[in-house]
């Protein structure tokens, strides 16, 4: 049995295949997932697992260089926005690198997901609970 933090075989596999600047999306239950991206559906019911639970587990195993958020999260979901920023700050310290955070419109965000290696759907049912994680290198 795998001893690492990610037991889900699809998530573990996609993270292990990421190259520098490849992207991985963690999204809420409502984000449309393009056919061009692999869909990893973790949603069991509303709120399970939460967006932050999925982000936490994924970022324990993935080296993150940048994160892209929809601008709308600032106004429409400020509490989750702050929680995510705090998590990314702590991740920077753990990884020993700076994580660039950028924002785009929700419409543009949805277009960017088409280029991701995979989209991991959480059970989160709060607005704009989505992030595009850009892979860094460990050296």
Curated annotation (Swiss-Prot):
Localization per Swiss-Prot or TrEMBL: Cytoplasm
Pathway: Carbohydrate metabolism; D-ribose degradation; D-ribose 5-phosphate from beta-D-ribopyranose: step 1/2
Enzymatic class: isomerase
GO biological process, one term: D-ribose catabolic process
Key word DNA repair present: no
EC numbers for this chain: 5.4.99.62
Keyword annotations from UniProtKB, A to Z: Carbohydrate metabolism, Cytoplasm, Isomerase
Iron-sulfur in keyword set: no
Reaction(s) catalysed by this chain's protein: beta-D-ribopyranose = beta-D-ribofuranose
Annotated substrate binding sites: 28, 106, 128-130
GO terms, molecular function: D-ribose pyranase activity; intramolecular lyase activity; monosaccharide binding
Gene Ontology cellular component annotations, sorted alphabetically: cytosol
Pfam families (UniProt xref): RbsD_FucU
Domain of life: Bacteria
Subcellular location, principal: cytoplasm
Annotated InterPro entries: D-ribose_pyranase, RbsD-like_sf, RbsD_FucU
Active site per database record: 20
Function: Catalyzes the interconversion of beta-pyran and beta-furan forms of D-ribose.
Subunit-structure text: Homodecamer.
UniProt family annotation: Belongs to the RbsD / FucU family. RbsD subfamily.
Protein name, entry field: D-ribose pyranase
Organism, as annotated: Salmonella arizonae (strain ATCC BAA-731 / CDC346-86 / RSK2980)
Gene: rbsD
């Amino acid at each position: 049995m795998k001893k690492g933090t990610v037991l889900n075989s699809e998530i573990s596999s996609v993270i292990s295949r990421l190259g520098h600047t490849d992207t991985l999306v963690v999204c809420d239950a409502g984000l449309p997932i393009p056919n061009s991206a692999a869909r990893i559906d973790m949603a069991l019911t509303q709120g399970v697992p939460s967006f932050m639970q999925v982000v936490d587990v994924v970022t324990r195993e993935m080296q993150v260089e940048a994160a892209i958020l929809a601008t709308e999260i600032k106004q429409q979901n400020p509490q989750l926005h702050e929680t995510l920023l705090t998590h990314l700050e702590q991740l920077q310290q753990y990884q020993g690198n700076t994580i660039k955070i950028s924002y785009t419109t929700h419409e543009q965000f949805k277009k960017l997901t088409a280029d991701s290696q995979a989209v991991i759907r959480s059970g989160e049912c709060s607005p704009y609970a989505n992030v595009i994680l850009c892979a860094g290198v460990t050296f």
